[in-house]
């Protein structure tokens, strides 16, 4: 009798439009579609890391229940509009940005002054409208976070936010706007009682739907791994992988076993890595910045590109991996 549980053999990602995608996985054993679909949906909506404006200081404004001469919106509406700006920070956890504009016209996210490592995903988003003689001067603090954090929690927990004129915002860090899933029928040979999981995701553009699913699955794996250690058991022992066999690779995050070609680096960067026998992402993250800079033809620009691509997947250079490479990993 077959005792092994089926696992998906195909994963298809279909782009449905701007920042929307459908991820289809099949086949699953009966019931696993709902089990995993619901878990993924909850994690995607509640636990994804993102960026949001958390504090604002506006020149001439002492509190949010104010109005500004020459600005059509009151301060409350300006703050609500500001929450709609989608930020993305590269290699940093927080930043303070400036917005200064005067004269009649529309103030958009494009008017926010940003350094090279801060990206605004929706630069045409409207923040305020200025009348003739109007002026808007504000400082915006953007932070990295997870989920939703009410402003009153931060207001009373951080002494630095108690200065007059500093307005603390409710922060919705999650880059995932909507998630739905459906379970359909799947078939493998003579079995017709299997599940196909269809997950539809809409993000704010700071992360792709595919990366969001990957990150949420990683969170679930890390949380469930705790149960594998009950009674002092070793996580690795749960998988019953034969020593030296291909199953040894299951101890590593699957993304580490992928070729560096999937990072979609520039041709120059990719060729430099291959020249150093760096074929897998697991090989790459173990190298330090200094080691990579010693690579012929790989300069600071290529290094920054590599760091940004890794950071988008929750990885960094200089990480340590025990027992790498896993036995059975194909050598190229």
Curated annotation (Swiss-Prot):
Residues 252-332 are annotated as: Alpha C-terminal domain (alpha-CTD). GO terms for biological process: DNA-templated transcription. Keywords: DNA-directed RNA polymerase, Nucleotidyltransferase, Transcription, Transferase. Its EC number is 2.7.7.6. SMART domains: RPOLD. GO terms for molecular function: DNA binding; DNA-directed RNA polymerase activity; protein dimerization activity. GO terms for cellular component: cytoplasm; DNA-directed RNA polymerase complex. Signal peptide: none annotated. It catalyses: RNA(n) + a ribonucleoside 5'-triphosphate = RNA(n+1) + diphosphate. SUPFAM superfamilies: C-terminal domain of RNA polymerase alpha subunit (SSF47789), Insert subdomain of RNA polymerase alpha subunit (SSF56553), RBP11-like subunits of RNA polymerase (SSF55257). The keyword Transferase applies. Residues 1-231 are annotated as: Alpha N-terminal domain (alpha-NTD). Gene3D superfamilies: 5' to 3' exonuclease, C-terminal subdomain, DNA-directed RNA polymerase, insert domain, RNA polymerase, RBP11-like subunit. Belongs to the RNA polymerase alpha chain family. Homodimer. The RNAP catalytic core consists of 2 alpha, 1 beta, 1 beta' and 1 omega subunit. When a sigma factor is associated with the core the holoenzyme is formed, which can initiate transcription. The N-terminal domain is essential for RNAP assembly and basal transcription, whereas the C-terminal domain is involved in interaction with transcriptional regulators and with upstream promoter elements. DNA-dependent RNA polymerase catalyzes the transcription of DNA into RNA using the four ribonucleoside triphosphates as substrates. This is DNA-directed RNA polymerase subunit alpha. It comes from Delftia acidovorans (strain DSM 14801 / SPH-1). The gene is rpoA.
């Amino acid at each position: 009798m077959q005792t092994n549980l089926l696992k998906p053999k195909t994963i298809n990602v279909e782009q449905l439009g701007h920042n929307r995608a459908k991820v289809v996985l099949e086949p699953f054993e009966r019931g696993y579609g709902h089990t995993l679909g619901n878990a993924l949906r909850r994690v995607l909506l509640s636990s994804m890391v993102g960026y949001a404006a958390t504090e604002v200081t506006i020149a001439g404004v002492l509190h949010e229940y104010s109005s500004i001469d020459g600005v059509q919106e009151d301060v409350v509406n300006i703050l609500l509009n500001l929450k709609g700006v989608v930020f993305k920070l590269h290699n940093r956890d927080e930043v303070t940005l400036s917005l200064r504009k005067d004269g009649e016209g529309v103030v958009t996210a494009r008017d926010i002054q940003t350094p090279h490592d801060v990206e605004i995903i929706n630069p045409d988003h409207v923040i305020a409208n200025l009348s003739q003689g109007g002026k808007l001067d504000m400082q915006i603090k953007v932070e990295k976070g997870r989920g939703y954090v009410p402003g009153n929690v931060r207001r009373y927990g951080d002494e630095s936010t108690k200065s007059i004129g500093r307005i603390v915002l409710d922060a919705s860090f999650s880059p995932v706007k909507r998630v739905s899933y459906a379970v359909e029928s799947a078939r493998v040979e003579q079995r017709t009682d299997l599940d196909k999981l269809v997950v539809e995701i809409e993000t704010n553009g700071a992360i792709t739907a595919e990366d969001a699913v990957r990150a949420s699955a990683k969170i679930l794996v890390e949380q469930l791994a705790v149960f594998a250690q009950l009674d002092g058991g070793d996580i690795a022992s749960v998988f019953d992988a034969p020593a030296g066999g291909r199953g040894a690779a299951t101890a590593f995050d699957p993304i580490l076993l992928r070729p560096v070609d999937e990072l979609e680096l520039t041709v120059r960067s990719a060729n430099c890595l291959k020249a150093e026998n760096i074929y897998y992402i697991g090989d790459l993250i173990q190298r330090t910045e200094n080691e990579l800079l010693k690579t012929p033809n790989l300069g600071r620009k290529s290094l920054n590109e590599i760091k940004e691509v890794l950071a988008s997947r929750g990885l960094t250079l200089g990480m340590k991996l025990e027992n790498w490479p896993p036995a059975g990993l194909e050598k190229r």
